[in-house]
Amino acid sequence: MSFVVTAPPVLASAASDLGGIASMISEANAMAAVRTTALAPAAADEVSAAIAALFSSYARDYQTLSVQVTAFHVQFAQTLTNAGQLYAVVDVGNGVLLKTEQQVLGVINAPTQTLVGRPLIGDGTHGAPGTGQNGGAGGILWGNGGNGGSGAPGQPGGRGGDAGLFGHGGHGGVGGPGIAGAAGTAGLPGGNGANGGSGGIGGAGGAGGNGGLLFGNGGAGGQGGSGGLGGSGGTGGAGMAAGPAGGTGGIGGIGGIGGAGGVGGHGSALFGHGGINGDGGTGGMGGQGGAGGNGWAAEGITVGIGEQGGQGGDGGAGGAGGIGGSAGGIGGSQGAGGHGGDGGQGGAGGSGGVGGGGAGAGGDGGAGGIGGTGGNGSIGGAAGNGGNGGRGGAGGMATAGSDGGNGGGGGNGGVGVGSAGGAGGTGGDGGAAGAGGAPGHGYFQQPAPQGLPIGTGGTGGEGGAGGAGGDGGQGDIGFDGGRGGDGGPGGGGGAGGDGSGTFNAQANNGGDGGAGGVGGAGGTGGTGGVGADGGRGGDSGRGGDGGNAGHGGAAQFSGRGAYGGEGGSGGAGGNAGGAGTGGTAGSGGAGGFGGNGADGGNGGNGGNGGFGGINGTFGTNGAGGTGGLGTLLGGHNGNIGLNGATGGIGSTTLTNATVPLQLVNTTEPVVFISLNGGQMVPVLLDTGSTGLVMDSQFLTQNFGPVIGTGTAGYAGGLTYNYNTYSTTVDFGNGLLTLPTSVNVVTSSSPGTLGNFLSRSGAVGVLGIGPNNGFPGTSSIVTAMPGLLNNGVLIDESAGILQFGPNTLTGGITISGAPISTVAVQIDNGPLQQAPVMFDSGGINGTIPSALASLPSGGFVPAGTTISVYTSDGQTLLYSYTTTATNTPFVTSGGVMNTGHVPFAQQPIYVSYSPTAIGTTTFN
């Protein structure tokens, strides 16, 4: 039958709206009647009179019909109003009846509630969260059981309440989480750190309530609580002066075991399904490995060797899946047994501890959890599938210059369980292994000119082995055995460490990529069931495929002149699972056939070779992985993995390239260069001069014949004589100029160029200004190859010097570099046009006496605001207030020198177009 839901207030509102519509229509009809019922003829002829009479008759007919429609409208609105009033009266009566029904139900339930604490009709109460309280039982005659409350930390969840004759059982409560383990204590000087405490076990999930005796499903079991976090390992003690090695960091605590899933409730004896069991709780995360102690600087040793960081704790095992509830009884509707819950996810392995001042290795990742066991099927029902294995923990991160930790192994798949009348359950897949930990970068400690050895990037950690697939369940009478689970894939090897090739350090090799993990073995197929009378036994299940091996790690980019690391070898393919045993013959039936063996997994691909540095040598490609072995009964060997890709050849043309920029004393920018393949030396980056000028005492290599001589000087009083040579300038990372003019000082007064630059520690001046006419024969930037000679971006805040086109957008560009024309304002005074030199090497700068309105020979007073605008005075370029240590010197000249201030406030790009003029862009 159909049902009608009515809201009396809505009907009353609709009737009111209809009344308003009727009024508007009546007014419109009255207005139309005046103009349409008595039309005047358009002319005095008979035709015009006939047309006017015809249309007037139409209008009168419309008015007659409108009166009838209005009457119907009024009747309809009145009907809606009456209906709303009647529904309102009925609602009042129904409310009284409902109240009476609740009172009657209370009277019915009172005796049983008093005698046995359970209503005759009604649902049971739910357990309070966090208490593990059991759910209340449902009504004896009719009602569902209440849900169990969740458990307190480490405690089980409450059991679901049972139903009566008719009703569903309540769900079991979730188990409480495990308590975290205590952290290990730090070691004494030279000693090892203490191990972290293990995490607590998660509480078990509550059991599901039973379904009604006559009808109803069993309640689902509660989920097991997650295991507690393992405690962090203690920090290793620092090395003693007598012995340079620091202590080993403590091992991280083992993560707590996840709680077991709750048992599903039993279904009704006649009609109903068994409850689904709860999943096992998640395993706790392994504790963080303790940091290795720093090496102590011993007598005659530059740097002590730090001990290895503590190993990360294993992830906790996942909780076992709960057992599925039994299904309906004999003669009733046969419900399926509950599926076995998945094993809890294995906790991630703790990261390896940080190595000491030398190069400690990262700890290994923890192992993954084990998958849950499949639930038992009821008579006639199918068996539950085995749970999947937990995923292996990731390998620990390595420190600078050390190897990455190995990935944890994947958990094994759960075993399927056969059932009466059903096929064997499928074994769970093995968990995927964790990836190998990433290694650190190559560590360098001393500048290259001293010729000390520099560390190489660490080797990537090996990927963890894949978990084995679960065995297939045994088939019952006349049914096939379950299929074995697939083996988990091996984890990928960690990437090799980067080689370093930065300023003030020798280039070194990139680390090798880690080997891929071995694929997990496939599960064995289940045994076939005994043949039924007159029938044949079931075939055994097929063995699971071996997991594919993990890929070898790819080696990373190395510095110029160094070799890229070799790609890691691919992991071996997992062996195929064994064939299942054929079923036993039934009476008169033929025995089942053994299943075919699965193919072995393919070997993983070798890792890519590392890219050589610019103009460097390319890396070696990695070897392919070994194919997995097939089984004796029909399996095929896996294919050999492909070789890794050949490392890239160093690039010779670039659009942009960057080198480090070091700021000395917060005011002097310094970069490192090498002339004609010599040692790397520091030079002052100076936009206020043109050409490279070097102190001869730091240059020992032969530059060839002298191509010119001259005499020049710098503001500050230094005058020098020089020889000019044609040679190459190397900025590192393969940034090598074409042969260009370099000025080498032969004599100077007063003192040497090195003494003149002693504040910055530089041994030369790299003048990059296009239009200032200062000493030198050419700018080094114009000798850069390709587009790198377009200009240079100076970004002191980021610590970089970038060659090539400007990569920043939205800047303000003015003509001239470094000499240009600007408008200057002193405090709130008027704007004054003045020539200016944007001089990165000018320290605090100078200002003309006429511009500052101050006598020459002194400094601008602290607290003076100097603002510099474009020459039209419309756009501010930069502004600052002077201090006692940052104020320009007042000179009698006519050109303002900005000093370092604008470069400290923002990135500035110097363009070499147009030639000999250039532009300056404030970004």
From Swiss-Prot:
InterPro entries: PE-PGRS_N (IPR000084), PecA_C (IPR048054), Peptidase_aspartic_dom_sf (IPR021109), PGRS_rpt (IPR048996)
Gene Ontology cellular-component annotations: cell surface
Motif extent (D(T/S)G 1): 686-688
Broad class of the protein's primary localization: other
Organism phylogeny: Bacteria, Bacillati, Actinomycetota, Actinomycetes, Mycobacteriales
UniProt short sequence motif D(T/S)G 2, positions renumbered to this chain: 839-841
NCBIfam families xref list: PE_process_PecA
Binding-site positions, Zn(2+): 686, 839
GO molecular function: aspartic-type endopeptidase activity; metal ion binding
Family as reported in the entry's similarity comment: Belongs to the mycobacterial PE family. PGRS subfamily.
Domain notes: Contains an aspartic proteinase-like domain in the C-terminal region. However, the enzyme is inactive. A comparison of the structure with pepsins showed significant differences in the critical substrate binding residues and in the flap tyrosine conformation that could contribute to the lack of proteolytic activity of PE_PGRS16.
Compositional bias of kind Gly residues: 124-170, 427-440, 454-500, 510-553
Residue ranges of the region described as Aspartic proteinase-like domain: 650-923
Record-annotated PE domain positions: 1-91
Residues covered by region (Disordered): 121-170, 330-351, 427-561
Keywords attached to this entry: Metal-binding, Zinc
Subcellular location field: Cell surface
Residue stretches in coiled coil: none
Protein name: PE-PGRS family protein PE_PGRS16
Additional facts recorded: Expression of this gene in M.smegmatis leads to increased levels of NO and IL-12 and poor survival of recombinant strains in macrophages.
UniProt gene name: PE_PGRS16
Induction / repression: Expression is induced in macrophages and infected mice. Highly up-regulated during the early stages of invasion of the human blood-brain barrier.
Organism expressing this protein natively: Mycobacterium tuberculosis (strain ATCC 25618 / H37Rv)
